[in-house]
């Protein structure tokens, strides 16, 4: 708390990005709660103690709205909250604490956000197993990390966003299905598309989002899903050639993580 107080002292704004996300938030809920909820409370208290309180830009998640399979898209910011895992419940609790505080804040509920730099982060085996459990028609809206950074940066000096809760997604051109999104990687690596039969039918909490207000206020939708595809193609242009002789073996290993009969 002392370090946080020192870091926040005399700042004009704070972007609070520290968080433990799935899958670790689900396998180590105690640690995740300490970082996600208690850590956020420390930041809130530090801001509240400042003579001139800085704006807190708080990244939340589309996951707070729960499973999307019975929802008519796009998801609206005022739709009910339904936590389906620890991570979503932590975000809901943090949002609740922000609204109960007297500090200036803006909440940004983020869509699926990865790029060519962080796509391999985390427990790969656990993520692959989970990936194959989900329904191929699950809606997902991608948010490029560049677009997220622009949105957060633009929020810092925009008084119109204070007290608002906004969705961050890269727009209609970045709205796709789970199958299409997952196949971007193997397709780019020259492995071909994964078969529909490898996937299960579990719902998920991603969705297409109504980002009209956030785009109007923050003007952030720039790179999107097309930018992500270009980055992967550039990053793996030589690896694709090296992997070509082993593509069958790699596909077979990936599909071993599926509980379905592909």
Regions found by a protein language model. Give the residues of each.
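Glycine/proline-rich active-site loop of Rossmann-fold NAD(P)-dependent oxidoreductases
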Residues: 101, 115-125, 155-166
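Flexible, glycine-rich beta-alpha linker
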Residues: 65, 85-86, 106-124
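Catalytic helix-loop patch of NAD(P)-dependent Rossmann-fold dehydrogenases
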Residues: 34, 69-108, 133-134
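Mid/C-terminal beta-alpha module of Rossmann-like enzyme folds, strongest
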Residues: 151-217, 227-231, 236-239, 243-247, ...
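Glycine-rich "substrate-gating" loop/helix at the edge of Rossmann-like oxidoreductase active sites
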Residues: 84, 111-118, 134-146, 170-174
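NAD(P)H-binding glycine-rich loop region in Rossmannoid oxidoreductase-like domains
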Residues: 1-35
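Conserved Rossmann-fold NAD(P)-dependent oxidoreductase catalytic core, especially the SDR/UDP-sugar
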Residues: 20, 41-86, 106
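Substrate-positioning beta->alpha
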Residues: 122, 132-156, 164
